[in-house]
Amino acid sequence: MITWSSLSVNEKKQALARPAMANSQQLKQTVGDIIARVEKEGDEAVLDYTRKFDCPDLTSLVLSQENIDALAAKVTPEVASAIDTAFNNIKMFHEAQMPSDIALTTTPGVKCELRFTALDAVGLYIPGGSAPLPSTVLMLGVPALVAGCENKLLCTPPNKEQLIAPEIAYAARKCGIDKIFLCGGAQAIAAMALGTDSVPQVDKIFGPGNSFVTEAKQQVSQRADGAAIDMPAGPSEVLVLADEFANPEFVAADLLSQAEHGPDSQAILVSNSATLIEESKAAVERQLATLSRAEIARPAMENARYILADSIEQAIEASNAYAAEHLIVQIENARDYLPKIKYAGSIFLGPWSPESAGDYASGTNHVLPTYGYAKNYSSLGLLDFMRRYTIQELSADGMRNLGPAIMALAAAEGLDAHEQAVALRMQALKQGDA
């Protein structure tokens, strides 16, 4: 247990320090080589990598519509109903985010507009691994659908049978995803960013992944001919704020639900109650023994931090300094403390709001900034699948009214051509008035 008030400024930073992210020169070089090969060889390179890492007998990158429909039909009624429920809630929440265009007159004769339009082509990346992730399909696919993105494609690693999990196929079809491609890793990111004969080039890439995927997203986003990306990514994390009234079993379950994501997941409990901390630690051990993914969760919990604060206000100070991806607030009258919480990717308020709700079906998006990026990045939302642009229209009166100010500013900056573009119009107006 760490006592927050006894720490120096540097010790507080150390208590909240995250593990160093993979950023080796070797990783950069390997990913760079993969991107270069995909750019040069296209489908053949992607097929070769996919055969090497995922499916030795893969013959095509494209999952046929027939296979998508057949796989979707295999989903059990219970899971299909759950996906439908999550889809409806996520759709409702993201539909409410639809922005309105703006049009106003800033100066007599000067009209300014702000308009929004959907991105044309988006690439959604769904990682492989030990379990399917239909929830991530929904979190990426639903806002793309609501935004009105015309072309939505999905890349995910195939299994040994050249297929994907039925749940992913069902969720993708539900979201109106146009095409599914059987590839993963840096090679999938490169294919979507640069385009191949099979995989169309997209405007923006969304979705989580391992260090190779993360590095590939960073590299393609820095290329003029590449693609934009959603946000920086790091290991998943949770911080639980709890007082003496919190249920230690709930607290432990929330810490463990984060830890089971992976051994590098971060789990932190900050409380003003030493008793609550000790009871929560004991509950963690009891619950950990019952988990099917205990071997994954245990290393993460061995690195968990338990911080004792003098007060709830001090606990919130620690929380703001950490800027957690997921912030669970199990405090009496939790909503009253919202104005004091500055930084978090998503907040789970009160004892009946586990992280699992947002991860799956409450309606909010589970793609969130990690690694402290919650201080300057936001959770994924509808606007990430759109772009905004401005329009200005000046009438003759608008030019008369605003022209002198434009010319004065252009002259002050020494940009003669800017000044001349207005001066010529002002002169034409004077001649017309004569």
Name what the model sees in each region:
Residues 1-120:
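N-terminal Rossmann-like NAD(P)+-binding subdomain of aldehyde/semialdehyde dehydrogenases
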Residues 1-7, 179-184, 306-311:
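Short acidic-hydrophobic, aromatic-tinged amphipathic segments that line or gate anion-handling sites
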Residues 99-104, 265-270, 290-300, 328-331, ...:
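Flexible, glycine/charged-enriched surface loops at secondary-structure junctions
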Residues 104-170:
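Conserved small-residue-rich beta-alpha loop and adjacent elements
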Residues 176-250, 254-266:
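Conserved NAD(P)+-binding/catalytic subdomain of aldehyde/semialdehyde dehydrogenases
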Residues 257, 261, 269-344:
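A glycine- and small/hydrophobic-rich beta-loop-beta segment
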Residues 320-434:
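C-terminal core of ALDH-fold dehydrogenases
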